Curated annotation (Swiss-Prot):
Active-site residues (renumbered): 143
GO molecular function: ATP binding; protein serine kinase activity; protein serine/threonine kinase activity
Annotated protein name in UniProt: Serine/threonine-protein kinase mos
Annotated source species: Apteryx australis (Southern brown kiwi)
E.C. designation(s): 2.7.11.1
Domain Protein kinase: start-end pairs: 2-200
EC class of the enzyme, as a word: transferase
Residues noted as binding ATP in the record, renumbered to the chain: 8-16, 29
Family: Belongs to the protein kinase superfamily. Ser/Thr protein kinase family.
C-alpha cells in the first residue's frame, strides 16, 4: 500500500518522503523517537494529527496515520499527507530552490526572482484564509513561517507542518506552557515570547 520513493527533507522530529499510497502520490512524515526528549517527540506526532479530519484548500491534508513501525525503525509513527510539492514560501522569498532561481525579471541581479505584487497578494490571501479556517476550528499553528507554507504547482499556498500546533478548548490553551517541543523562536507571536496563554 505504501511505497517510499525519495527523501524530501528532514527536521528536528522526523523525515519527510515522497511516496505512493494506494497508487496516489503522497508525502510521508516519519516521526523519529528522540533519545533526548521522548515526550517532545510524542507531542509533535500527536500535534500533527490536530488537522487530521480537516479539509481546506489552504491546509495540507492528512490522509492517514499509524503508530505501527518495524522494530528496526527508530520511529514513533507515520503520517501520510497530500503531496503538495517541495517548494515553500521560504524558497520563493530567498531564492533557494532551482524552481525559483534567477530569471529575466531578476531585479538588481541578486540571484533571485522578485515576487510580483499579484503573487504577494495571492500568497497573503491564501495564508490568511488558511489561518482563519484553522482558528475557526480551534487550532493554532505556533510555528508559522515561510518554510512551513508550501506552494503547489498551481500557485496555491498551503499551511503545513503542524508539529507544534495546539487544539484550543473554548478559545484558550489549557496550559501557559506552549509548544514544549520548540517552534522557531524568530517567528513566535509576541504573546508566546511573554509567556502568555495561546488564544485564537
Amino acid at each position: 500500500q505504501l511505497c517510499l520513493l525519495q527523501p524530501l527533507g528532514s527536521g528536528g522530529f522526523g523525515s519527510v518522503y515522497k511516496a505512493t499510497y494506494h497508487g496516489a502520490t503522497v508525502a510521508v512524515k516519519q516521526v523519529k523517537k528522540s533519545s533526548k526528549n521522548r515526550l517532545a517527540s510524542r507531542q509533535s506526532f500527536w500535534a500533527e494529527l490536530n488537522v487530521a479530519r480537516l479539509q481546506h484548500a489552504n491546509v495540507v491534508r492528512v490522509v492517514a496515520a499509524s503508530t505501527c513501525a518495524p522494530a528496526s525503525q527508530n520511529s514513533l509513527g507515520t503520517i501520510i499527507m497530500e503531496y503538495v510539492g517541495n517548494i515553500t514560501l521560504h524558497h520563493v522569498i530567498y531564492g533557494t530552490s532551482d524552481a525559483w532561481r534567477q530569471g529575466e525579471d531578476d531585479e538588481g541581479g541578486c540571484g533571485k526572482k522578485a515576487l510580483s505584487m499579484e503573487e504577494t497578494v495571492c500568497y497573503s490571501c491564501d495564508i490568511m484564509t488558511g489561518l482563519a479556517f484553522l482558528h475557526s476550528q480551534g487550532i493554532v499553528h505556533l510555528d508559522l513561517k515561510p518554510a512551513n507554507v508550501f506552494i503547489t504547482e498551481q500557485g496555491v499556498c498551503k499551511i503545513g507542518d503542524f508539529g507544534c500546533s495546539q487544539k484550543l478548548e473554548d478559545g484558550l490553551s489549557q496550559s501557559p506552557q506552549v509548544c514544549q517541543q520548540g517552534g522557531t523562536y524568530t517567528h513566535r507571536a509576541p504573546e508566546l515570547l511573554k509567556g502568555e496563554r495561546v488564544t485564537a
